[in-house]
From Swiss-Prot:
Compartments, record wording: Cytoplasm, Nucleoid
Gene3D superfamilies: Nucleoid-associated protein YbaB-like domain (3.30.1310.10)
Upper classification of the organism: Bacteria, Pseudomonadati, Pseudomonadota, Betaproteobacteria, Neisseriales
Major location (coarse): cytoplasm
Function: Binds to DNA and alters its conformation. May be involved in regulation of gene expression, nucleoid organization and DNA protection.
Gene Ontology MF terms: DNA binding
InterPro entries in alphabetical order: YbaB-like_sf (IPR036894), YbaB/EbfC (IPR004401)
Name of this protein: Nucleoid-associated protein NGO_0742
Stated family: Belongs to the YbaB/EbfC family.
Amino acid sequence: MFGKAGLGGLMKQAQQMQENMKKAQAKLAETEIEGEAGNGLVKITMTCAHEVRKIDISPDLIQEAADDKEMLEDLILAALKSARGKAEETANKTMGAFTQDLPPGVGDFFR
């Protein structure tokens, strides 16, 4: 099916793709995404590797939520979900560029 030269070239391409994907994953691990809830009253900054780096709660919300712990918890959770969704979307776009021309399932071998 493949000659020695063809198989060697294919392996070299696969190794190069794997190296490029590792570099992209390292960059994503440092790329910060912000999610928010309550029209910006709660903001969460996380990396595309899902490491939460910052939680910002508006002082106005803290005063308003003094008697409504559940509302504050809901807003924090919503901001976290927003950030996570954006992080996953960014990661999928970045990593998808490497595997878009491969047959289905083959790209999983490079992760």
